[in-house]
Amino acid sequence: DASELAAQMVSGDLDIALVPANLASILYQKTKQGVEVIDINTLGVLYVAAADDSIQSIADLKGKTLYMTGKGTTPDYVLQYLLSANGMTSDDLTIEYKSEAAEVAAVLKEQTDAIGLLPQPFVTVAMAQNENLKMVLNLTEEWEKTQPENGSALVTGVTVCRKDVLEDQADAVDTF
């Protein structure tokens, strides 16, 4: 659980952690700039899954209900950005937030017309439970459509390290 990792990083009980990208900035503030991002460990991995073949772009989500996790987390920020880049806001669709990806997968299994935003491997699990479900939008591809000039990547996970550990044990961190 990312919140447990965050608490351990803030308290100094944990030296290095792999965390969602948005959590790195929170840790940076909570530790008074006491952590650094040392690498990007996850790019992309976010998908919109549905049985509805008519969903072929972000704009096709208009007027629909989308199930997803984590209000105020990386998937939410990505969605909000993509909506804005496509001339939309969250008011153009209904977003139902669930507390974890397994809950979104359960909705997709129970409601055959549901649409969900899930990371891997949860989208694959959901598809295994509902044979009509497919990945209709790859959010990495949607992100890249908004970034043709600068090649920005959709970063979803990073590794953070306490600065004192980085300074005092540089060889160990390099080995990590």
Language model features by range: what are they?
Residues 1-97, 112-120, 131-139:
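Short, glycine-/small- and polar/acidic-enriched structural segments
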Residues 4-5, 102-104:
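Short acidic active-site motifs
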Residues 22-23, 103-176:
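Pocket-lining segment of extracytoplasmic ligand-binding domains
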